Swiss-Prot record:
GO terms for cellular component: cytoplasm. This is 5'-nucleotidase SurE. The keyword Metal-binding applies. The lineage of its organism: Bacteria, Pseudomonadati, Pseudomonadota, Betaproteobacteria, Neisseriales. It comes from Neisseria gonorrhoeae (strain NCCP11945). A divalent metal cation binds at D8, D9, S39, N91.
Length: 248
């Protein structure tokens, strides 16, 4: 089985090295990742300039584009390699709740799903670098189970690994997405020339960490797996929307 691996932290990130190393024990792996950190770019594509595919000394390939670009390149530009499955990650930091809308890690998996492949995004609920051992041990468990009977149809799964010691991981839970409050206000500043500039403020606090949510269960020490879908239609609002837009 051929597995394409990407991320949004860039090809030099520790998380993608761990993911590639573990996945290589189960499948034929190729890595195509951004040349630099592209966190928060969501599903964006590079349409205003050409892309370049280069190979690093460690064998990983990198692209001067976004995570979504990398999936396109990995699918259509690698000689003698056609992916059956796509893994994205391991992201340095969680991707839970509405964060998934902004995440390049999740976006790479989403693009693969749209192309008709099973896809899994992996994230570690920690940005300090203290819990990579937990992430690696969790991956062995997750991928051993995955490759026993790989999905035969496209799936899109978002996995978050808790920031606890390896022995303190409590198991796996299937969850729904939680929610955050709206992000905080932008932060005004001045550049060295005295010109007004702005920084996007920090993310908002979690507003929904109830039992059964990714925020709640991952925070309680569980590996969370959340099945995602592409259809954003608000089906319960169809009738109300039709009534609002009804004209005689």
């Amino acid at each position: 089985m051929n597995v394409l691996i990407s991320n949004d932290d860039g090809y030099l990130a520790e998380g993608i090295a761990i993911l590639a190393r573990v996945a290589s024990e189960f499948a034929n792996v190729r890595v195509v990742a951004p040349e630099r950190d592209r966190s928060g770019v969501s599903n964006s594509l590079t349409l205003d300039r050409p892309l370049q595919l280069k190979q690093a000394q460690n064998g990983f390939c990198y692209v001067n584009g976004t995570p979504t670009d990398c999936i396109h390149v990995g699918q259509f530009a690698l000689p003698d390699f056609k992916p059956d499955v796509v893994f994205s990650g391991i992201n340095r930091g969680a991707n839970m709740g509405d964060d998934t809308l902004y995440s390049g890690t999740v976006a790479a998996a989403t693009e693969a799903y749209l192309m008709g492949m099973p896809a899994v995004a992996f994230s570690l609920n920690d940005a300090s670098g203290r819990y990579w051992a937990t992430a690696e041990k969790a991956l062995w468990t997750l991928l051993a189970h995955f490759f026993k009977k790989p999905p035969s149809a496209p799936v899109l799964w978002n996995v978050n690994i808790p920031a606890v010691a390896p022995e303190d991981v409590r198991g796996i839970k299937i969850t729904r997405l939680g929610r955050r409050h709206h992000e905080q206000n932008i932060v005004p500043s001045r550049n060295p020339r005295g010109e007004q500039i702005y920084w996007i403020g920090p993310v908002g606090e979690v507003s929904d960490r109830e039992e059964g949510t990714d925020f709640g269960e991952c925070g309680a020490g569980f590996i969370t797996v959340t099945p995602l879908q592409i259809d954003l239609t608000a089906y319960p609002d169809m009738a109300e929307t039709a009534a609002f837009w009804h004209t005689d």
